[in-house]
């Protein structure tokens, strides 16, 4: 099987391999990773043909392009030996074609004279066509992979250009700076497009976002051909009554306007006000004979409860029958604001998975984001369900915390152990403070104090060790006041 070099973007490294595999699955082409390293933008894969390579790379967000691999080696002598042994029979078909040679270095560079010498070293290929820097018939590129602060490359690749991805065009088109309607919680456009790829969004599929906000995820899914709809507990966000988060922007902006901006209105079914625990969507009853799901996929970024405690629709206090009767038709009155109660973020994640199990078709995907503190055992808090297979976990790290994109596949009925689905039981927490229900929210506002206290203790240990060394060498022992001063200064610097 031919080998190809994928030129990756050196960003969101834990997402890159997952996205490539998802795109190959969508295109229906077998893909095998021959060489992949997170600290390098060069990846070697096996693909059946050039046409398969074009399909696999076409809508990638984290790959820049794909090249037919003509040779590789740790030195230029090894590279040329590899090119001769692998591609000699390929040269005649390009003998009269116009061509272009370029050189790219990762963490290193070459002067113009050095680049010219490297290009001349391939003269044994004896191409007779004219060199052309713009729109050549065939383009070749040398890739040099350097270690940091090292002048010689550690590895070199040589390849023939096959195709670019849509990365640059998509990022430019969906840039949030150019979007008419955004909010303070709108997710970066690159990540929404990436989530759509990993969730196997494809033309003709039906996708739903239960926390749509200003419509970032539905827009990304619609861009790749899906039919989309969404919901949110705050109807003002959907209708645009709260205004835009962009300074100086006036006028009426809403989710529909965003779809019109990208000419995607025909793919948008609409939106409604709801939370996932009280959804008006049909929840099919479990059936052993057939699967009754109707969604091809779910993409969402659930609220973490940081800016305000996580809430769902419902009263915090139990209502008497008389009170419930009097409130029954109040939602029809103008200006009605539905009551809300605090809710557990962990319980919400379980609700999302239970909803996915009930509504996804077999092999349907759900991709959702969730936060976690870096100093916790992350695997323990990843939710699970016997009817869902966790296919990938991708991490986006921040300063003191991180969030993960979890992707699940809806298992077919024959894949689910008998009785496993019925054994899933959930406990609902009511009437508690939002911080008690949401461990991540509490840690966020405490500034991850456990981490800070560990850092201060480490600084004190360093100071004590310094004092012991001075005593051993006959120096003056610093007093308690000096130790406190050093610790305070170190804290200030950190």
Where are these regions (language model features)?
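Short, solvent-exposed coil/turn linker segments
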Residues: 30, 74-78, 82-90, 111, ...
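A short N-terminal interaction module
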Residues: 86-149, 156
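Class I S-adenosyl-L-methionine-dependent methyltransferase catalytic core
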Residues: 1-54, 61, 107, 133-137, ...
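Conserved AdoMet
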Residues: 38-93
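Charged/polar, solvent-exposed surface patches and flexible loops
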Residues: 22, 81, 85, 117-125, ...
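Generic detection of long, well-ordered alpha-helical segments
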Residues: 10-14, 73-80, 108-116
């Amino acid at each position: 099987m031919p080998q190809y070099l994928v030129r990756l973007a050196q960003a969101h490294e834990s997402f890159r391999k997952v996205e490539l595999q998802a795109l190959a699955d969508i295109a229906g082409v077998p893909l095998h990773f021959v060489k992949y390293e997170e600290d390098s933008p060069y990846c070697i894969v096996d693909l059946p043909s050039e046409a398969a390579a074009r399909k696999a790379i076409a809508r990638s967000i984290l790959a820049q392009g794909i090249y037919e691999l003509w040779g590789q080696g740790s030195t230029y002598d090894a590279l040329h030996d590899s090119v001769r042994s692998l591609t000699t029979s390929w040269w005649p078909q390009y003998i009269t074609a116009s061509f272009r040679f370029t050189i790219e270095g990762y963490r290193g560079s070459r002067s113009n004279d050095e680049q010219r010498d490297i290009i001349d070293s391939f003269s044994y290929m004896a191409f007779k066509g004219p060199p052309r820097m713009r729109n050549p018939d065939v383009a070749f590129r040398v890739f040099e992979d350097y270690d940091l602060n090292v002048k010689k490359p550690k590895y070199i690749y040589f390849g023939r250009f096959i195709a670019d991805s849509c990365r640059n065009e998509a990022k430019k088109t969906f840039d949030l700076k150019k979007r008419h309607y955004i909010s303070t919680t709108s997710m970066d456009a690159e990540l929404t497009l990436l989530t759509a790829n990993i969730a196997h969004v494809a033309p003709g599929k039906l996708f739903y976002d239960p926390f749509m906000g200003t419509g970032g995820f539905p827009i990304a899914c619609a861009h790749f051909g899906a039919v989309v709809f969404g919901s949110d507990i705050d109807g003002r966000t959907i209708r645009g009554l709260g205004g835009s988060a962009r300074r100086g922007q006036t006028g009426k902006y809403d989710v529909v306007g965003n779809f019109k901006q990208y000419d995607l209105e025909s793919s948008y079914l609409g939106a409604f006000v709801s939370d996932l625990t009280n959804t008006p969507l049909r929840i099919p009853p479990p059936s052993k004979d057939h699967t009754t799901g109707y969604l091809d996929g779910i993409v969402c970024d659930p609220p973490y409860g940081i800016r305000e405690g996580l809430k769902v629709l419902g009263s915090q206090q139990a209502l008497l029958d008389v009170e419930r009767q009097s409130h029954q038709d109040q939602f029809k009155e103008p200006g009605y604001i539905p009551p809300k109660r605090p809710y557990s973020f962990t319980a919400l994640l379980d609700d999302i998975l239970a909803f996915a199990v009930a509504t996804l078709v077999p092999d349907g995907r759900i991709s959702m984001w969730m936060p976690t503190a870096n100093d916790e055992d992350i695997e323990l808090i990843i939710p699970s369900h016997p009817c869902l297979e966790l296919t990938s976990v991708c991490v986006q790290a921040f300063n003191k915390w991180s969030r993960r994109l979890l992707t699940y596949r809806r298992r077919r009925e024959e894949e689910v152990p008998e009785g496993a689905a019925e054994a899933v039981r959930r406990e609902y927490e009511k009437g508690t403070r939002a911080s008690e229900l949401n461990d991540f929210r509490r840690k966020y506002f405490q500034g991850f104090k456990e981490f800070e206290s560990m850092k201060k203790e480490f600084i004190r240990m360093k100071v004590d060790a310094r004092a012991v060394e001075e005593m051993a060498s006959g120096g003056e022992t610093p007093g308690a006041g000096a130790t406190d001063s050093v610790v305070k200064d170190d804290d200030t610097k950190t």
